[in-house]
Amino acid sequence: MKNVTDSFVSLGHWPSAGSFGFNTDILATNPINLSVVLGVLIFFGKGVLSDLLDNRKQRILNTIQNSEELRGGAIEQLEKARSRLRKVETEAEQFRVNGYSEIEREKLNLINSTYKTLEQLENYKNETIQFEQQRAINQVRQRVFQQVLRGALGTLNSCLNNELHLRTISANIGMLGTMKEITD
């Protein structure tokens, strides 16, 4: 503490200013010069420094504000993009579901129409088989009838002689006459 007070006391003892020149005593001149320079710098530089700091502060605030606005715009665009993405995903899901359901519906329609066609073909086949069976039965009947008729004619021709033939005709005429009398 004593050193500090001694330095202030030594400041009070100025050598007489008889001439202007360089003072080579660093300890005596530097604190005074430094205090004067610092005082002038603080007095005049305070406004300049304050203006520089205010300008810098304003630029930083403007940059922050612009960044916030850009950030807000980017967030808004991001939300719009997300919304569009959700909408497109929903539409894609609907198209996929509708496509699958349409495919399933077409598949069922195709299966049903194929089943109906097969059923119709089965019915047609059964009808054709029945028709062919009936036709074959009729042909067999005709052939059997023709063979029986030929056999009967052959038997009649071989068994019948003229006298038997005349008796059969007379008997038949007699039966017809009796039937006529009954009906009259």
Swiss-Prot record:
Signal peptide: none annotated. It is found in: Plastid, Chloroplast thylakoid membrane. GO terms for molecular function: proton-transporting ATP synthase activity, rotational mechanism. The keyword Transmembrane applies. The chain crosses the membrane at residues 27-49. The keyword Protein biosynthesis does not apply. It is a single-pass membrane protein. Disulfide bonds: none annotated. F(1)F(0) ATP synthase produces ATP from ADP in the presence of a proton or sodium gradient. F-type ATPases consist of two structural domains, F(1) containing the extramembraneous catalytic core and F(0) containing the membrane proton channel, linked together by a central stalk and a peripheral stalk. During catalysis, ATP synthesis in the catalytic domain of F(1) is coupled via a rotary mechanism of the central stalk subunits to proton translocation. Component of the F(0) channel, it forms part of the peripheral stalk, linking F(1) to F(0). F-type ATPases have 2 components, F(1) - the catalytic core - and F(0) - the membrane proton channel. F(1) has five subunits: alpha(3), beta(3), gamma(1), delta(1), epsilon(1). F(0) has four main subunits: a(1), b(1), b'(1) and c(10-14). The alpha and beta chains form an alternating ring which encloses part of the gamma chain. F(1) is attached to F(0) by a central stalk formed by the gamma and epsilon chains, while a peripheral stalk is formed by the delta, b and b' chains. HAMAP family: ATP_synth_b_bprime. In plastids the F-type ATPase is also known as CF(1)CF(0). This is ATP synthase subunit b, chloroplastic. It comes from Nicotiana tomentosiformis. The gene is atpF.
